[in-house]
Curated annotation (Swiss-Prot):
Alphabetical list of CDD domains matching this protein: EF-G, EFG_III, EFG_mtEFG1_IV, EFG_mtEFG_C, EFG_mtEFG_II
Protein name: Elongation factor G
Keyword line: Cytoplasm, Elongation factor, GTP-binding, Nucleotide-binding, Protein biosynthesis
Gene giving rise to this polypeptide: fusA
Entry function: Catalyzes the GTP-dependent ribosomal translocation step during translation elongation. During this step, the ribosome changes from the pre-translocational (PRE) to the post-translocational (POST) state as the newly formed A-site-bound peptidyl-tRNA and P-site-bound deacylated tRNA move to the P and E sites, respectively. Catalyzes the coordinated movement of the two tRNA molecules, the mRNA and conformational changes in the ribosome.
InterPro entries: EFG_II (IPR041095), EFG_III (IPR009022), EFG_III/V (IPR035647), EFG_IV (IPR047872), EFG_V (IPR035649), EFG_V-like (IPR000640), EFTu-like_2 (IPR004161), G_TR_CS (IPR031157)
Gene Ontology CC terms, in alphabetical order: cytoplasm
Species per Swiss-Prot/TrEMBL record: Haemophilus influenzae (strain 86-028NP)
Any Gene Ontology biological process: ribosome disassembly
């Protein structure tokens, strides 16, 4: 089968925004104008095509990034047909991992901003992720029909808050309820969309007289941005010559691809205006797979390799999302970087060194699917029934193995205990959690050895709510959630010598007798955690009982004398004791050892250790004082801050127990404009008052 669309006409783009900037509605309109969906889905009535999980339609927020293929030939059919693969990404801070993984497989992005709200906090986080992966982007200022809409204010915020070199491609005609269309600054024509056919057709008209001067000024700004692409154009421009439309467009494209400028378009997706011109901008300015650098990877011999976007190169692809589908089981979304694959072919998962057979391949249109026989470089598709693939794995040709750059996923930061409501739910819950953990690398499940409870960990409180919600809906498992947990530890600070433990029951018949004398001493936290030294001389305790002494102490370490938490970082020296020919046994020595350990532990200055998190907060400069003040109240140690003019990064170490509810508090202190990440750093001694409260709570 030959390629239907040349790879130069592919656009793999993400649509990214803050919650409520109208991203899903914008995506819906793209699907409508590109002829994929015949009825426009509205988020307002829970019918949007891209939001396909029930919860998304209820909450009106997008959680999973669905990938959809659409075709576009331009507003006035001025291009050959282009294939646009759209990845819809969530805008909520708890789902940053979803945004991160879609940025990894995109070539370009459309950043959607609300004309009223402007550049909001999550937009700053998403912007930083796009910078990290060097994704070329354009902006679409949506909701121009809303009260308080102000296009140029948003352009200004792109410059001041994000440090973007924002260059408007259009100016809006009117605003709020008087918003009627846009002026194309390259053509210097007004575009008016026909409301009768939901904006499918439009007319070019003269620029309104009252906008002429403004449009001239902004066109000058645009042409100058284009001229900076090369010395020849700059000379032509400075010499007073006009640049042709073709020259302007190709120069702007060059600068967008180099991440030097952000072109800004505007409209109202809800009112069917502007999305059509934004699609033209996607085709004209965002990269094809051939415009971006070859993807890097590691060859089997550990040297660096790469794959170019070409059908001729060996097959390589990256699995970027696993989704569970009610009808076909696992869907593995993957992006093809090079080569061709047919359904039925076998490939290598080079990360796990396992072979996988591509049974069926489907191209997704939101939640509808079309079976296809082959995929080629540049395609994004989903495979059904791959056995052992997780997010971030490379699938490649068996004869040309390579491991493509992996995605990095943050460590989970919050844990809660879950228990099934009924016995019947028990087994189903294990299955459901395993399935969900496979889909989402930032979600983990483990069993707490101390309490036997099932603990789930994730990126935030909303993240875990949604996991529990999905268990209920998709797997019909009802579960109760506990309070967020902190795992403390216990240890000692001073050495104690010659503490004895004696277990003796000798009242006629076979008795029990064990007697040990031990020293207890602290170990370095970087060390083994526990050591046992046997220094018995002259057989005062026979060799066969020594392991029982060690075992008796190790059993005590699982649940410490202070508050029942695991004991770490201590050593035991066994150096004296006594035994009885008849009455001594392994059990008696085990019990004697545990008595000696408890007695020694209480004398060795026992302390409670708490987990300390490494916390990084990124905040606009005006909130630094509030953020640091709040961190100090949480017993934080602030290690330093780095600033540029848009954002200050604060590094701190904070006890985990003080971080519950932090996301909500940080949001309210900074009007939602700051973001934070945290990961486990170390254990440190808890202050006396904190330790006393924890110990007290455990006794209840």
């Amino acid at each position: 089968m030959a390629r239907t669309t040349p790879i130069e006409r592919y656009r793999n783009i993400g649509i990214s925004a803050h919650i409520d900037a109208g991203k899903t509605t914008t995506t819906e309109r793209i699907l409508f104008y590109t002829g994929v969906s015949h009825k426009i889905g509205e988020v307002h009535d829970g019918a949007a095509t891209m939001d396909w999980m029930e919860q998304e339609q209820e909450r009106g927020i997008t959680i999973t990034s669905a990938a959809t293929t659409a075709f576009w030939s331009g507003m006035s059919q001025q291009f050959p047909q282009h294939r646009i693969n759209v990845i819809d990404t969530p805008g909520h801070v708890d789902f940053t991992v979803e945004v991160e993984r879609s940025m990894r497989v995109l070539d370009g992005a459309v950043m959607v901003y609300c004309a009223v709200g402007g550049v909001q906090p999550q937009s700053e986080t998403v912007w930083r992720q796009a910078n990290k992966y060097e994704v070329p982007r354009i902006a679409f200022v949506n909701k121009m029909d809303r009260t308080g809409a102000n296009f140029l204010r948003v352009v200004e915020q792109l410059k001041t808050r994000l440090g973007a070199n924002a260059v408007p491609l259009q100016l809006p005609i009117g605003a709020e309820e008087n918003f009627t269309g846009v002026v194309d600054l390259i053509k210097m024509k007004a575009i008016n969309w026909n409301e009768a056919d939901q904006g499918m057709t439009f007319t070019y008209e003269e620029v309104p007289a009252n906008m002429q001067a403004d449009c001239e000024e902004w066109r000058q700004n645009l042409v100058e941005a284009a001229a900076e692409a090369s010395e020849e154009l700059m000379e032509k421009y400075l010499g007073g010559e006009d640049l042709t439309e073709e020259e302007i467009k190709s120069a702007l494209r060059q600068r967008v691809l180099a991440n030097e400028i952000i072109l800004v378009t505007c409209g109202s997706a809800f009112k069917n205006k502007g999305v059509q011109a934004m699609l033209d901008a996607v085709v004209e300015y965002l990269p094809a797979p051939t415009d971006i650098p070859a993807i890097k990877g590691i060859n089997p011999d550990e040297t660096e390799g790469e794959r170019h976007a070409s059908d001729e190169e060996p097959f390589s692809s990256l699995a970027f999302k696993i989704a569970t589908d009610p009808f076909v089981g696992n869907l593995t979304f993957f992006r093809v970087y090079s080569g061709v694959i047919n359904s039925g072919d076998t490939v290598l998962n080079s990360v796990r060194q396992k072979r996988e057979r591509f049974g069926r391949i489907v191209q997704m249109h939101a939640n509808k699917r079309e079976e296809i026989k082959e995929v080629r470089a540049g395609d994004i598709a989903a495979a059904i029934g791959l056995k052992d693939v997780t997010t971030g794995d490379t699938l490649c040709a068996i004869e040309a193995p390579i491991i493509l750059e992996r995605m990095e996923f943050p460590e989970p930061v919050i844990s809660v205990a879950v228990e099934p409501k009924t016995k019947a739910d028990q087994e189903k819950m294990g299955l459901a959690l395993g399935r969900l953990a496979q889909e989402d690398p930032s979600f983990r499940v483990h069993t707490d050895e101390e309490s036997g409870e099932t603990i789930i960990s994730g990126m935030g409180e909303l993240h875990l709510d949604i996991i529990v919600d999905r268990m209920k809906r998709e797997f019909k498992v009802e579960a109760n959630i506990g309070k967020p947990q902190v795992s403390y530890r216990e240890t000692i600070r001073t050495r104690v010598n010659d503490v004895e433990g004696k277990h003796a029951k000798q009242s006629g018949g076979r008795g029990q007798y064990g007697h040990v004398v031990i020293d207890l001493y602290p170990l370095d936290p970087e060390g083994p955690g526990y050591e046992f030294v046997n220094e018995i001389k002259g057989g005062v305790i026979p060799g066969e009982y020594i392991p029982a002494v060690d075992k008796g102490i190790q059993e005590q370490l699982k649940s410490g004398p202070l508050a029942g938490y695991p004991v770490v970082d201590l050593g035991v020296r066994l150096h004296f004791g006594s035994y009885h020919d008849v009455d001594s046994s392994e059990l008696a020595f085990k019990l004697a050892a545990s008595l000696a350990f408890k007695a020694a532990f209480s004398k060795a200055n026992p302390v409670l250790l708490e987990p300390i998190m490494k916390v990084e907060v990124e905040t606009p400069p005006e909130y630094v004082g509030d953020v640091i003040g709040d961190l100090s109240r949480r017993r934080a140690m602030v290690n330093g801050q780095e600033a540029n003019e848009f954002v200050v990064k604060i590094d701190a170490e904070v006890p985990l127990s003080e971080m519950f509810g932090y996301a909500t508090d940080l949001r309210s202190q900074t009007q939602g404009r700051a973001s934070y990440s945290m990961e486990p750093l170390k254990y440190a001694e808890a202050p006396t008052s904190v330790a006393a409260a924890v110990i007290e709570a455990r006794k209840k």
